């Protein structure tokens, strides 16, 4: 007998499980994959290097609450993420900043542009590329067009398989232009990485006598929703269910598939000390991959004359396929959000079912936001259970 069933052992499911377990609740987790940690899962290769199997995940937050919670399960070391992009044959900081500008433009033109940008946006440290390309200043607008073309147009087309003009503005605005020399990818007050990796962090988080984890368990082969009630292997299930997976799959895709973009990764082990000058280098233009990550530059491991890189290729999402079978990014637009709301409306009729997480809520979500939302959800679940007793 369990008090809660949680589907998914990523940050959302694991956080909720831990909070409820510490309140004396018995929790069972069903995880579809053969490992915990969701897309944060790390695996050590023959080089002894921990690889982010599902692409680079860098922790950053302004929430002391989230960081305090996670530090219970891992030490962290300071890490400020810096990304370079190959533009016109040169490596420059991404987001595009004044160093990028001075590297790619003639000196006199660079100085003049910096002065005009500071004068036009005196109170701003960052500016959206969409603001630059719509500027009333012709020189600023021309600069914006250059950055838009070199940094956004082709990268976005590769990532989303759509022309940049058809991609939601929220996607474009995730990467600003920096009006200064700050070359950090994130500006959050807290930027750090778990000292011995995300997998170890999840192992400790889920190590509690009130938590049972079942791996390689397809919840959808056991759960059925009917008439506002949840059934488990044909029997009505009265305990609350927290679902962190895709809602369209939960309802048998009755309205069709929610669109996602997927990724494919190619790992390569090399007998060299260093492959590239930054942990991540973006390739926004000619190449068919979008970026290369050098794993040990993320993990902080000191392993001379061996390194592992991963090339990241965007892919169409095809459920269950060997390539592109994992949903990574929801495709944000009004039509897709309306489709999600149709699924959400049906699921509201199930009071024992709680949706939590980036897949369940069909939204792009940083790790810290996922943890914060999970902490809030766990507290509400516990309060609701206490009120019913």
Please give the residue ranges for each predicted region.
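Short, well-ordered alpha-helices that flank and scaffold nucleotide-derived cofactor binding pockets
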Residues: 18, 22, 42, 207, ...
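Short hydrophobic core segments
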Residues: 6-7, 30, 235-248
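Conserved beta-strand segments of alpha/beta enzyme cores
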Residues: 26, 50, 75, 210-212
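Active-site/ligand-binding neighborhood in enzyme catalytic cores
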Residues: 88-92, 98-239
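C-terminal segments that line or cap access tunnels to active or ligand-binding sites in enzymes
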Residues: 239-240, 248-387
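Dinucleotide-binding Rossmann-like beta1-alpha1 core, especially the glycine-rich loop
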Residues: 47-120
């Amino acid at each position: 007998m369990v008090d809660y069933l949680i589907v998914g052992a990523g940050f959302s499911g694991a956080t909720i499980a831990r909070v409820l377990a510490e309140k004396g609740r018995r929790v069972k987790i069903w995880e579809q994959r053969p490992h915990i940690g969701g897309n944060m899962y790390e695996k050590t290769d023959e080089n002894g290097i921990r690889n982010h199997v599902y692409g680079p995940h860098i922790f950053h937050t302004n929430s002391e609450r989230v960081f305090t919670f996670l530090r219970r399960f891992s030490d962290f070391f300071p890490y400020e993420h810096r990304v370079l992009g190959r533009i016109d044959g040169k490596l420059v900081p991404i987001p595009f900043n004044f160093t990028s500008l001075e590297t790619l433009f003639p000196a006199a033109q660079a100085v003049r542009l910096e002065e005009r940008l500071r004068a036009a946006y005196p109170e701003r440290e960052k500016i959206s590329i969409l603001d630059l390309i719509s500027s009333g200043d012709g020189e600023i607008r021309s600069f914006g067009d250059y950055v838009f073309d070199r940094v956004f147009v082709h990268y976005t087309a590769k990532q989303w398989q759509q022309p940049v003009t058809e991609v939601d503005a929220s996607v474009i605005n995730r990467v600003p232009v920096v009006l200064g020399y700050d070359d950090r990818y994130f500006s959050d007050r807290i930027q750090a990485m778990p000292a011995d990796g995300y997998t170890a962090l999840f192992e400790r988080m889920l190590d509690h006598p009130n938590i049972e984890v079942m791996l390689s368990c397809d919840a959808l082969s056991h759960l059925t929703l009917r008439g506002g009630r949840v059934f488990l292997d044909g029997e009505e299930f009265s305990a609350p269910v927290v679902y962190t997976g895709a809602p369209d799959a939960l309802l048998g895709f009755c309205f069709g598939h929610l669109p996602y973009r997927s990724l494919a990764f190619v790992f390569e082990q090399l007998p060299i000390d260093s492959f590239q000058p930054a942990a991540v280098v973006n390739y926004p233009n000619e190449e068919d991959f979008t970026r290369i990550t050098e794993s040990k530059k993320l993990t902080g491991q000191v392993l001379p004359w061996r390194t592992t890189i991963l090339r990241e290729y965007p892919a169409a999402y095809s459920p269950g396929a060997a390539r592109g079978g994992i949903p990574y990014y929801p495709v944000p637009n009004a039509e897709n959000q309306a489709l999600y709301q149709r699924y959400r409306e049906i699921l509201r009729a199930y009071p024992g079912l709680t949706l939590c997480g980036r897949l369940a809520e069909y939204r792009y979500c940083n790790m810290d936001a996922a943890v914060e939302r999970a902490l809030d959800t766990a507290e509400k679940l516990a309060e609701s259970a206490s009120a019913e007793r």
